[in-house]
Amino acid sequence: LKRVKAQGTFFIITSVLQGRLPSAHRVHVLLSHFSVAELIRLFHVFLKDFYPDLASQYRIDIKKRLTRRRLHEDIATANFKETLIVLPEDIKAQFLRYCFKKFNLDADEINRDIFIGEKEIWILKKDGLEIGSHTHNHYALDAISPSTFTGDIKLSAATLLNLTNQSPSVFSYPHGRLQEAVKPVLTEVGFKYAVTIERRGLKTDDDKFLIPHYD
């Protein structure tokens, strides 16, 4: 970016600065080590053992797509990810801890390896690059309550302000998901723009809180 004199925005999940590995990244780590068939089988065992009343509701179909999202992925992988996204956060976190313990994966070490820290963020800021918010906990904003996403967005913005001495003005939706009630919160917190995961060029009449972007 510096060589071609291009402006870039780095969206920070602020909980990683506290050493936390977000759920989505735990899923990516698991899928990079193990087959999706093995993980789905383990998920079904987990539900049967800990949440038998939810086992049928969250059973993962490997033949029919749950949504039209993730068409670039095979059905099993897409449905595994989509199911975990809508799973209640406490149950999702418990399942992922269960997997990491079973497979002897060190979340703290992985977090240090894959994410930049405060020093690197400062360098990016010093070099004139934009520091945006990707929330604090990287929750899918259409799957949690307004009180939860309001607190999460405010915490992320406050953390970045404290770190960079500047309030973030650009926001990126985790998983590209939102509900309409998120937009007023972004305005209240001081964000000027927000980007989705829609990959296309910008139009003059695009909503400033629904800007497509390439990453």
Protein language model regions, located:
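Short beta-alpha junction loops
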Residues: 12-18
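Histidine/lysine/aspartate-rich catalytic loop segments that bind and position anionic ligands
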Residues: 116-148
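Short beta-strand segments
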Residues: 12, 100, 132-135, 170-175
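Extended, charge-rich helix/loop segments that form flexible
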Residues: 20-127
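Residues that form or immediately flank small-molecule/cofactor binding pockets and catalytic motifs
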Residues: 15, 136, 199
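C-terminal active-site subregion of NodB/CE4 polysaccharide deacetylases
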Residues: 2-8, 19-37, 50-54, 70, ...
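A short alpha-helix capping/helix-coil boundary motif
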Residues: 98-101, 136-137, 160-163
